[in-house]
C-alpha cells in the first residue's frame, strides 16, 4: 500500500507539466515587442530623446519578462518534473540543471526587481504627467521588492552556511 501511495505522489508531479507549457503562451510578448518596433520605425527620426528612451525601456521590460519566463519554465520543469534530455551539450544552456529551488527563487526575485526598476525609470521619465502619490506608491512597491529579494538571498545564504557547519 505504501509503495502505491509513494508512486502516486511521485507521478503527480506531472500535473505541473501543463502549467509549464501554459507559461509558453506568455511568449505572446514577442508580438508586442515587434509591434512596438514596427510602430516606432516611421517616427524614429522625429521622436524626442526621452520618447525614444521610453520605447527602449519598454523593449527592455519585455526582454526581461521573456527571460524570466524561460528561466521559470526550464528550471521548474527540470527541478520538479524531469531532466531535459538535450543530446547536443553545446546547445544546452549553461545554467540548466544547476539551479535548485532557492537559486530559482533568488533569480526570480532579482528579475522582478529589474523589471520593477525599468517600470520605475519609465515612471520617473513621465513624472510631470503622473500624480505624486502614484509615484510614491510605486517607489514603496519597488522597495518592497528589493527588500524581499535581499531577505530571500540572506535566508538562502544563511541556510547554506548552516549546511556547511553541520
Curated annotation (Swiss-Prot):
It comes from Buchnera aphidicola subsp. Rhopalosiphum padi. Pfam families: UPF0114. The keyword Cell division does not apply. Keywords: Cell membrane, Membrane, Plasmid, Transmembrane, Transmembrane helix. This is UPF0114 protein in repA1-repA2 intergenic region. It is found in: Cell membrane. Belongs to the UPF0114 family. Coiled coil: none annotated. NCBIfam families: HI0507 (TIGR00645). GO terms for cellular component: plasma membrane. The chain crosses the membrane at residues 14-34, 52-72, 135-155.
Amino acid at each position: 500500500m505504501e509503495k502505491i501511495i509513494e508512486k502516486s505522489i511521485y507521478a503527480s508531479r506531472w500535473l505541473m507539466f501543463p502549467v509549464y507549457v501554459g507559461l509558453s503562451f506568455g511568449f505572446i510578448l514577442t508580438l508586442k515587442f515587434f509591434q512596438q518596433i514596427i510602430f516606432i520605425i516611421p517616427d524614429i527620426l522625429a521622436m524626442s530623446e526621452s520618447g525614444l528612451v521610453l520605447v527602449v525601456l519598454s523593449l527592455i521590460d519585455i526582454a526581461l519578462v521573456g527571460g524570466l519566463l524561460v528561466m521559470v519554465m526550464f528550471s521548474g520543469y527540470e527541478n520538479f518534473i524531469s531532466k531535459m534530455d538535450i543530446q547536443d551539450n553545446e546547445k544546452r544552456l549553461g545554467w540548466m540543471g544547476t539551479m535548485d529551488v532557492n537559486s530559482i527563487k533568488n533569480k526570480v526575485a532579482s528579475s522582478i526587481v529589474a523589471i520593477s526598476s525599468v517600470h520605475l525609470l519609465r515612471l520617473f521619465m513621465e513624472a510631470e504627467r503622473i500624480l505624486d502619490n502614484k509615484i510614491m506608491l510605486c517607489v514603496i512597491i519597488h522597495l518592497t521588492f528589493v527588500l524581499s529579494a535581499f531577505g530571500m538571498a540572506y535566508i538562502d545564504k544563511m541556510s547554506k552556511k548552516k549546511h556547511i557547519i553541520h
